[in-house]
Regions:
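Short aromatic-hydrophobic micro-motifs that form the base-stacking/packing surface
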Residues: 162
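Active-site-proximal alpha-helical scaffold in enzymes
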Residues: 65-68, 136-159
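Conserved "HGTGT" condensation-loop signature of ketosynthase/thiolase-family condensing enzymes
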Residues: 1-140, 165-248
């Protein structure tokens, strides 16, 4: 006769099986904002950024900083997490093209092409020197970034954690290798362990089925806007999201 592994829940919002492998966590969401992904969106508003700095922003920078600003009060300090599957791929492609032509790459272009460029621009724009994290994990970038954000929120219950995930379609030269996302998007999620108004339980189980990046964002947004349990089949795991008001 087989027995199911017992689950242990702690105040950290994490559930563990008896073999100590984490397989679920509560995401303590207090606010969120999305740009793109089929949601009616105007041009990303970044008027809060100094004009000199604003001129350096790429379209992805603008959308990422826009959704972040919507979720925050003026002069509010947060632990920032920026996640992107491709990052500033358009800038990187331009730099590689310059190098291939034997031209010196632009120092400014290089400094803005790295994955942590958005956190850096955010810190400058809002004069916030709080810790920042940058994550890129292939197709599972958004799902794994949620775990990182929730973990930081539970580890620092008095702090505000802000997750920004943004991407744009890869340049045509990469079409043979990757096509997603097909449209630019940005989503910001504010997490607060003590002030969550929309706690979501995230559960993952081993699976082999690659899902599209658009599907994971749509699936999570559906969970936030409805009472339904949603799921996404990632490259190595099946992810489930469900509201869990028992954690408030």
């Amino acid at each position: 006769m087989s027995t199911k592994p017992k689950m242990e829940c702690s105040e950290s919002g994490v559930s563990r099986k008896n073999e100590s492998r984490v397989n679920s966590i509560i995401i303590p969401i207090s606010d969120w904002s999305v740009w793109g992904m089929g949601v009616p969106s105007e041009q990303a508003d970044v008027k809060f950024i100094d004009p000199l700095l604003r001129r350096r922003l790429s379209p992805m920078d603008r959308s990422a900083l826009h959704v972040a600003n919507v979720c925050l009060e003026a002069h509010e300090r947060v632990h920032l997490i920026f996640a992107s599957r491709h990052g500033e791929l358009s800038r990187s492609t331009a730099l590689l093209t310059e190098i291939a032509k034997g031209e010196p790459p632009s120092p400014m272009g290089f400094s803005l092409s790295v994955l942590n460029a958005v956190p850096g621009l955010y810190g400058i724009a809002r004069e916030d020197t709080s810790p920042a994290t940058a994550i890129s994990a292939g197709e599972a970038t958004f799902a794994l970034a949620l775990i990182e954000a929730a973990s930081q929120a539970w580890r620092n219950p008095d702090a505000t954690v802000l997750l920004i995930c943004a991407d744009e379609p890869p340049p045509p030269i990469y079409a043979e290798f990757v096509q997603s996302p097909r449209e630019p998007y940005a989503i910001a999620i504010r997490l607060e362990a003590k002030r969550a108004v929309c706690p979501v339980r995230c559960t993952w189980t081993p699976a082999m089925n690659c899902g599209e990046i658009e599907d994971v964002i749509h699936s999570f947004i559906s969970c936030l806007t409805s009472e339904e349990k949603t799921q996404w089949a990632g490259p190595d795991h099946l992810w489930h999201w469900q509201r869990d008001y028992g954690q408030i």
